[in-house]
């Protein structure tokens, strides 16, 4: 049984759902449905909600839409539910402005992604994140390393330097490498809260020190993920592994094509009218939707 304080008392809880952004038939943000969905997620396994991240289609949301979405969702949820807002940008100035606004609006934390496209060196990443940290010193920040989307990898030694800032406390590790957790712990120690950025790697990453997950699958199987986590924490590894293996087809199906296309389709199949993703993302094709439907039926969702 792992007894490190940070492992047993994670900063944002165990399961954070990276929530989709619902759109109505006109393609506008459906704030009322966002309120209903976020409350449903909180009632079904999620400790917190991440808004305006990759799954929330932040690249195609205006800053005003993002602010209005946060205001609507945060105001509707129980205070025990953490609401983290994606405030990252490949412009340091924009990221600072968004993070300050999140803090002033009452966010529980900010998810700040590695700058994308311009591919800064590690020195530039340090400058970027330290400037954001200084701009909202009382707001907990979760760094977001996803090199497959950004084209840039945040190295553990850089994370270690950034931990000199008291509000840089956690990281979403989404490189797809289990070793990332071990490398981060070797550089930063157990003080860093590491969250898996991949549902399929949640259990393996927890076995080497991750504390939880920023999840897509929790839209559909939040209670099952919670059971898996607590079986593992209680030392019932075989039961945790059984759930992990049972859910693998869903984890794979939700990433058959670009996220959040499949999870929006899955929610539609279950009666949540969250709408299609905004262009340039496109809905699932017929064959993909049929495959996803089979997975959902096999899990009796």
Curated annotation (Swiss-Prot):
CDD domains: DHDPS. The keyword Oxidoreductase does not apply. Keywords: Amino-acid biosynthesis, Cytoplasm, Diaminopimelate biosynthesis, Lyase, Lysine biosynthesis, Schiff base. The keyword Lyase applies. GO terms for biological process: diaminopimelate biosynthetic process; lysine biosynthetic process via diaminopimelate. The active site is at 144 (proton donor/acceptor), 172 (schiff-base intermediate with substrate). SMART domains: DHDPS. It catalyses: L-aspartate 4-semialdehyde + pyruvate = (2S,4S)-4-hydroxy-2,3,4,5-tetrahydrodipicolinate + H2O + H(+). Pathway: Amino-acid biosynthesis; L-lysine biosynthesis via DAP pathway; (S)-tetrahydrodipicolinate from L-aspartate: step 3/4. InterPro entries: Aldolase_TIM, DapA, DapA-like, Schiff_base-form_aldolases_AS, Schiff_base-form_aldolases_CS. Transmembrane segments: none annotated. Pyruvate binds at residues 55, 214. HAMAP family: DapA. Belongs to the DapA family. Homotetramer; dimer of dimers. This is 4-hydroxy-tetrahydrodipicolinate synthase. It comes from Prochlorococcus marinus (strain MIT 9215).
């Amino acid at each position: 049984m792992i007894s490190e304080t940070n492992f047993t008392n994670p900063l944002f809880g165990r399961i954070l759902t990276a929530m989709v952004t619902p759109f109505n038939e006109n393609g506008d943000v459906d704030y009322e449905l966002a309120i209903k969905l976020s409350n449903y997620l909180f009632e079904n396994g999620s400790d917190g909600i991440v808004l305006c991240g990759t799954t929330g289609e932040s690249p195609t949301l205006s800053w005003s839409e993002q602010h209005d979405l946060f205001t609507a969702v945060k105001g509707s949820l129980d205070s025990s539910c953490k609401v983290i807002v994606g405030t990252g940008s490949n412009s340091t100035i924009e990221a600072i402005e968004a993070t300050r606004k999140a803090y002033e609006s009452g966010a529980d934390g900010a998810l700040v992604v590695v700058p994308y496209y311009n591919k800064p060196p590690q020195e530039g990443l340090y400058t970027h994140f330290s400037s954001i940290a200084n701009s909202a010193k009382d707001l907990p920040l979760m760094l977001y390393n996803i090199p497959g989307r950004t084209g840039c990898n945040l190295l553990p030694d850089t994370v270690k330097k950034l931990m000199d800032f008291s509000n840089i406390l956690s990281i979403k590790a989404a490189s797809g490498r289990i070793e990332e957790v071990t490398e981060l712990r070797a550089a930063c120690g157990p003080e860093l809260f590491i969250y898996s950025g991949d549902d399929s790697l949640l259990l393996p990453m927890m076995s080497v020190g991750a504390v939880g997950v920023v999840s897509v699958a929790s839209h559909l199987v939040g209670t099952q993920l919670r059971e898996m986590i607590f079986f593992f924490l209680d030392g019932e590894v075989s039961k945790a592994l059984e759930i992990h293996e049972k859910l693998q087809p869903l984890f794979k199906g939700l990433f058959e094509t670009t996220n959040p296309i499949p999870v929006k389709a899955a929610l539609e199949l279950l009666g949540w009218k969250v709408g299609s993703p905004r262009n340039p993302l496109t809905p699932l094709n017929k064959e993909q939707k049929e495959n996803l439907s089979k997975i959902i039926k096999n899990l009796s969702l």
